[in-house]
Structure formats: structure tokens, C-alpha cells
């Protein structure tokens, strides 16, 4: 059977970055504002400037804490099922950091939680756009037409433009956005959608 691929963002899709960052920020004396769950920008979530928020995100992403993030929702179970039962391999495309130690911690974190599911981990600069890397991946024959999972609508669209099949992981900050792709509340939704398409019975419903 030919190998099947899922290209995926990590933070907010596979790993619960928000939980880890929230604990780290609280430890450093920062508090979330009311209604934070509906805001994507970290500065707005903590009542600070965009620049200050971005600086703290980079600091967190390059700290030891980044190697110990928990799985998001039911990701651990269904990623393993897709890999072990249905022969899917995963490629991580994450705007984490260019720091090599951060990449090593991310790779170890994923392996500890997801076993051998991830074939490759691609780390971009903190908060970087993914357009160029998605275009490059689309030109690699084995990845052509793969699934593409994101929580940021703009990145989902960038992948769809390269022929990937988009799935948006729903959060408070994106739940009212219109996207070109399936919207999932958890990995069980993703699993059911992917397997349904494998069987030719896929339905596109929000």
C-alpha cells in the first residue's frame, strides 16, 4: 500500500501550546485579559503591545518548556491510530523557531507523545508565514495532494492554493472565519473525515 501523508501545523493542532504558554506566562507574572480565548494575537490576550507579546512568544519557544507541551485534545490517540492502523505518515510544518535546540526539543516532544508518526519536522522562524514551504512541499511527488491541518485560516488557504486538502482545527479565535476546507473540533473529527474520504464517503459539513 502506498504511503499516505498528513502535513500539519503543531501548535494549536497537535500540541496544546496555549496551555504551556499560559502556565509559563503566569509563572512570569502575566495574566490573561477577559475574552482572551477569542483573540489570536498574544499581545492582545495579555493586554500588551504586539511587539512585547511577540518577544515573549519567541522567548517561550526557545525555552526548555517547549519540549514538554501536552497533546491538544485527543490528538495523541488519533494521530497514533492514523499512523499505526491506516499507514499515514506526518510532516510537521511549524513556525516555532530557527533555534536548533528548540527544533530538537520539539522533535523529542512529538516522538514521546506520538511515537514514530512524524517522518519530518520542519521548523520555521517564530511566527513565520508558510507559503514558500508549502509550495516547496507541493512539488515533492509523495506529498502532492496530502492533507494539510492548521488553526490559522490564512495558512490553511496557503496550503489549499498548493493543492493540499485543508482541515481547520477550530478554536475560539477562528470559529467564525469562513475557510476553504473542513472544520474540525478535535482529532476524532479529523480522523472520521480523513477515513471517509479514503472510503469515498466524505461529507463537507461544519
Residue ranges and their predicted role:
Residues 26, 83-84, 160:
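Anion (oxyanion) recognition and catalysis
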Residues 15-17, 23, 90, 99-103, ...:
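Short catalytic/ligand-binding loop motif for oxyanion handling, primarily in non-cytosolic enzymes
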Residues 122-126, 181-193:
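Short acidic-hydrophobic, aromatic-tinged amphipathic segments that line or gate anion-handling sites
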Residues 66-71, 75-110:
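Substrate-recognition element of Asp-dependent hydrolases with the DxDx(T/V) motif
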Amino acid at each position: 500500500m502506498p504511503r499516505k501523508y498528513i502535513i500539519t501545523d503543531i501548535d494549536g493542532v497537535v500540541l496544546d501550546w496555549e496551555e504551556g504558554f499560559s502556565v509559563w506566562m503566569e509563572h512570569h507574572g502575566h495574566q490573561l485579559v477577559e475574552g482572551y480565548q477569542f483573540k489570536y494575537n498574544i499581545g492582545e490576550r495579555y493586554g500588551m503591545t504586539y511587539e512585547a507579546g511577540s518577544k515573549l512568544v519567541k522567548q517561550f519557544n526557545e525555552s526548555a518548556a517547549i519540549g514538554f507541551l501536552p497533546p491538544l485534545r485527543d490528538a495523541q490517540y488519533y494521530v497514533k491510530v492514523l499512523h499505526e492502523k491506516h499507514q499515514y505518515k506526518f510532516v510537521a510544518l511549524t513556525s516555532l523557531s530557527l533555534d536548533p535546540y528548540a527544533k530538537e526539543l520539539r522533535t523529542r516532544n512529538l516522538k514521546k507523545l506520538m511515537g514514530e508518526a512524524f517522518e519530518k519536522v520542519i521548523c520555521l522562524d517564530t511566527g513565520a508565514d508558510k507559503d514558500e514551504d508549502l509550495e516547496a512541499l507541493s512539488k515533492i511527488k509523495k506529498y502532492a495532494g496530502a492533507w494539510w491541518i492548521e488553526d490559522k485560516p490564512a495558512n490553511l488557504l496557503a496550503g489549499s492554493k498548493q493543492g493540499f486538502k485543508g482541515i481547520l482545527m477550530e478554536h475560539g479565535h477562528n470559529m467564525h472565519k469562513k475557510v476553504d476546507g473542513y472544520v474540525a473540533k478535535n482529532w476524532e473529527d479529523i480522523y472520521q473525515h480523513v477515513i471517509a474520504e479514503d472510503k469515498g464517503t466524505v461529507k463537507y459539513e461544519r
